[in-house]
């Protein structure tokens, strides 16, 4: 999540003024967060609230209203401020810009389960060693 947010902030000044170099400052005073950061935070809240469809809709509308000038596309902005909870036929790539947390949430189990098994084995062995020392 932090990587996505940092990337959004560092890239903010180049969003409409693309550059073709890897030589650019990491820290500038004119950097700012965009709608992608706001909606990434909304996705995080939605996942923490259960990760169901309504959780995502509620969080996106909430965060969109909290940060109305973050740079949303016209259709998304209209959707945020409407009572409509259905898809709004976006032509943009915004959903791709904030989906990283969904993959991270899914990969947690893939990553943790093998590590937990290994950790249990290590702790078991340490416990056996400690018992032998006592």
Regions of interest found by a model, annotated:
Residues 1-134:
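Structured, active/binding-site neighborhoods that engage oxygen-rich ligands
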């Amino acid at each position: 999540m932090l990587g996505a947010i940092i990337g959004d902030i560092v890239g903010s000044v180049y969003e409409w003024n693309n550059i073709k170099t890897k030589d650019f400052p990491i820290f500038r005073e004119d950097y700012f967060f965009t709608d992608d950061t706001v909606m990434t935070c909304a996705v995080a809240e939605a996942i923490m609230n259960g990760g169901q469809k309504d959780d995502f809709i509620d969080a996106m509308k909430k965060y969109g209203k909290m940060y109305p000038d973050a740079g949303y596309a016209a259709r998304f902005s209209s959707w945020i401020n409407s009572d409509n909870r259905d898809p709004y036929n976006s032509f943009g790539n915004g959903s791709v810009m904030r989906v990283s947390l969904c993959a991270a949430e899914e990969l947690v189990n893939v990553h943790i389960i093998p590590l937990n098994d290994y950790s249990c084995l290590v702790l078991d062995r340490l416990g056996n060693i400690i018992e032998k020392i006592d």
